[in-house]
Amino acid sequence: RFKKIRRLGALPGLTSKRPRSGSDLKNQLRSGKRSQYRIRLEEKQKLRFHYGLTERQLLKYVHIAGKAKGSTGQILLQLLEMRLDNILFRLGMASTIPGARQLVNHRHILVNGRIVDIPSYRCKPRDIITTKNKQRSKALIQNFIASYPHQEELPNHLTIDPFQYKGLVNQIIDSKWIGLKINELLVVEYYSRQT
């Protein structure tokens, strides 16, 4: 994880740790001139590691985004941001996306009153995300919500009721609220040159 954030910069979905300010400069000095391929590859890796996807999963999302109407890069980011594991992370119900994935896999999370144990479940507007009514489930979420730093930093497509451990998806995410600094066009370019 630390090698990844040193090389690619902050990846809030993977870890809350930040790269040291000097390490960025060292990487640039060590690497010399970066090729266009390397720049595209690093953007793709940043996206992959932030959302915790395998190469095959990311490729599948790129294909889905390519078939949809509109900007492929923007649609790709929307698809990734609307995954259940990412929504839990953005609501502050988990400290990282792998942590959110574990909550989902262990069946602690309900969507519209039904248990969903698939982290890649695509949330839709008006979905209500809650925890199971068990003490253990609530305790796990309570720890994260209590330590979540700024409720006012919540993206505008989400609302949370921290006392009822309930989150609401208001709408599809707007691109300015994406939680990662990334040039998504470079990711799309990377895959378009692979085929």
UniProtKB/Swiss-Prot annotation:
Write down the PROSITE patterns for this protein, in alphabetical order.
Answer: RIBOSOMAL_S4, S4
From the record, give the transmembrane residue ranges: none
* UniProt-listed SUPFAM superfamilies: Alpha-L RNA-binding motif
Task: Enumerate the Pfam families for this protein.
Answer: Ribosomal_S4, S4
Q: Which domain of life is it from?
A: Eukaryota
Q: Where, subcellularly, is it found?
A: Plastid, Chloroplast
Checking CDD domains in the record gives: S4
Which InterPro entries is this protein grouped with? Ribosomal_uS4 (IPR022801), Ribosomal_uS4_bac-type (IPR005709), Ribosomal_uS4_CS (IPR018079), Ribosomal_uS4_N (IPR001912), S4_RNA-bd (IPR002942), S4_RNA-bd_sf (IPR036986)
Ranges for domain S4 RNA-binding come to 82-143
List, in alphabetical order, the Gene Ontology terms for molecular function in this entry: rRNA binding; structural constituent of ribosome
Any one annotated GO CC term: chloroplast
Sequence similarity:
Belongs to the universal ribosomal protein uS4 family.
Q: How does it assemble?
A: Part of the 30S ribosomal subunit. Contacts protein S5. The interaction surface between S4 and S5 is involved in control of translational fidelity.
**What does the protein in this record do?**
One of the primary rRNA binding proteins, it binds directly to 16S rRNA where it nucleates assembly of the body of the 30S subunit.
Q: Which NCBIfam families match?
A: PRK05327.1, rpsD_bact
Q: What is this protein called?
A: Small ribosomal subunit protein uS4c
Task: State the gene name recorded for this protein.
Answer: rps4
